[in-house]
């Protein structure tokens, strides 16, 4: 029974976990510190530490919360973190579970702005080639700003003064606060849903601090400005203020009044320009008419108009010369053709087929006779050579040798005996004469050296 007073490790960790859960001060903790051991894990949960001068605590930030972080955390950066404290049972260690993280201080806002600007610049959102041209004579202008501020008043007064023809439509939105970015995006999407109804859009607000102007630096607002089909004029803050909306817009104006001036032409200036063009056009037309009248007078007073027949004298002379040249050319052509005809007849006579056929017949007979004579000579030569070869063969024939009284000897196997070294005593031999054979038996073998061997 004494063992019941001992807790298991799991039981103890569970008890401590419940203590943390039941402590209201640990349910929502606002913590500030410096990021330590931060290693960004792509598409995953983040594990790091927060520290100050004296201590540190382990932090876990699940992916669903980290994806909402609007800046790029880095090692050593000071941050504000919101979350709760709990125990990780398998290791028996308590840690901080972060649900939100923001950079600490105004310097952090500038750092966040800098990081987003670099990111969007790499994507090409600020490139000049993406800038759209502002139309010169807009029919309808959409304005995204606060409904109660001086911005819309300045824009409408300026636009109506300069170009009353243009219609101004306000799409009210919050321009400051936590929900301002969402409100700005919603207003721009309403404009985009109208298709090509609007020729240009103005987005802006009055001056303020960096925190006041921050909605115009939010990534979703900047991307929506970039995606608008019509040209966008940005007028956020004073001339010294520059937001990311100013950079991505097709044009930037220092004030709302300047934005309205950028979007609309000055009607009086345009009318003055039209009157000036009309005057120039009228003057040009008068000059052209005067020049044409002077030319007409010169033509009417010319000798050709007074005596029209002279107009054709030169042409008639030209026609006569051309006729003569044509006749001469035809006669020359005819003469050349006759000469060519005579030459062709001469060539045809020279190559008369009957004459060529007779020549070929005579040549064939001559060649046939030469072939017959050559064949006779050839056969005669071959017969003589054949007779000589037959005589030589007959002279070297063994039968001729036998006719002169010589014999040749073979053993009983029919092999020719040419030396006494091939026979032994009592061997049977055959002696061959020209008219028959004689069987013989060796009685004695006697070897004699001839004259060549003695030498």
Curated annotation (Swiss-Prot):
Record's catalysed reaction(s): Exonucleolytic cleavage in either 5'- to 3'- or 3'- to 5'-direction to yield nucleoside 5'-phosphates
GO molecular function, one term: nucleic acid binding
EC number(s) reported in the record: 3.1.11.6
Catalytic EC class: hydrolase
Domain of life: Bacteria
Keyword field contains Zinc-finger: no
Record's protein name: Exodeoxyribonuclease 7 large subunit
InterPro entries the record matches: Exonuc_VII_L, Exonuc_VII_lsu_C, OB-fold_nuc-bd_dom
Function noted in UniProt: Bidirectionally degrades single-stranded DNA into large acid-insoluble oligonucleotides, which are then degraded further into small acid-soluble oligonucleotides.
Predominant location category: cytoplasm
Pfam family, one: Exonuc_VII_L
Alphabetical keyword list: Cytoplasm, Exonuclease, Hydrolase, Nuclease
GO cellular component entries: cytoplasm; exodeoxyribonuclease VII complex
Family named by the database record: Belongs to the XseA family.
Known partners and oligomeric status: Heterooligomer composed of large and small subunits.
Localization (cell): Cytoplasm
One GO process term, biological-process aspect: DNA catabolic process
């Amino acid at each position: 029974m004494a063992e019941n007073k001992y807790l298991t490790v799991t039981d103890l960790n569970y008890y401590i976990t419940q203590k943390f859960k039941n402590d209201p001060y640990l349910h929502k903790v606002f913590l500030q510190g410096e990021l330590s051991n931060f290693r960004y894990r792509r598409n995953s949960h983040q594990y790091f530490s927060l520290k100050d001068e004296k201590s540190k605590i382990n932090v876990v930030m699940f992916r669903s919360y980290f994806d909402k972080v609007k800046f790029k955390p880095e090692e050593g950066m000071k941050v504000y973190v919101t979350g709760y404290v709990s125990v990780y049972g398998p290791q028996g260690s308590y840690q901080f579970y972060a649900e939100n993280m923001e950079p600490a201080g105004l310097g952090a806002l500038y750092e966040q702005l800098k990081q987003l600007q670099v990111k969007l610049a790499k994507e090409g959102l600020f490139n000049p080639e993406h800038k759209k041209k502002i139309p010169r004579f807009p029919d309808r202008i959409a304005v995204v700003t606060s409904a109660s501020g001086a911005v819309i008043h300045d824009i409408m007064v300026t636009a109506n003064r300069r170009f009353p023809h243009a219609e101004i439509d306000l799409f009210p939105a919050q321009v400051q606060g936590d929900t301002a970015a969402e409100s700005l995006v919603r207003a721009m999407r309403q404009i985009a849903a109208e298709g090509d109804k609007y020729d240009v859009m103005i987005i802006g607000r009055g001056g303020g601090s960096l925190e006041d102007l921050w909605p115009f630096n939010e990534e979703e607002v900047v991307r929506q400005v970039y995606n608008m089909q019509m040209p966008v004029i940005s007028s956020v803050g004073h001339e010294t203020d520059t937001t990311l909306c100013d950079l991505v817009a097709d044009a930037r104006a220092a004030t709302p009044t300047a934005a309205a001036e950028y979007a609309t032409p000055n009607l009086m200036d345009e009318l003055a320009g039209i009157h000036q063009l009309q005057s120039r056009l009228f003057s040009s037309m008068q000059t052209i008419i005067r020049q044409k009248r002077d030319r007409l007078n010169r033509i009417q007073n010319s000798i050709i108009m007074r005596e029209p027949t002279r107009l054709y004298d030169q042409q008639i002379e030209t026609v006569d010369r051309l006729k003569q040249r044509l006749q001469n050319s035809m006669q020359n052509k005819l003469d050349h053709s006759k000469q060519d005809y005579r030459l062709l007849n001469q060539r045809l006579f020279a190559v008369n087929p009957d004459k060529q056929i007779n020549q070929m017949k005579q040549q064939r007979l001559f060649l046939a006779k030469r072939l017959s004579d050559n064949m006779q000579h050839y056969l005669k030569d071959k017969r003589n050579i054949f007779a000589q070869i037959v005589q030589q063969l007959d002279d070297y024939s063994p039968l001729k040798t036998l006719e002169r009284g010589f014999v040749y000897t073979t053993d009983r196997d029919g092999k020719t005996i040419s030396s006494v070294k091939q026979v032994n005593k009592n061997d049977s031999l055959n002696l061959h004469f020209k008219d028959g054979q004689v069987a013989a038996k060796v009685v004695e073998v006697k070897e004699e050296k001839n004259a060549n061997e003695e030498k």
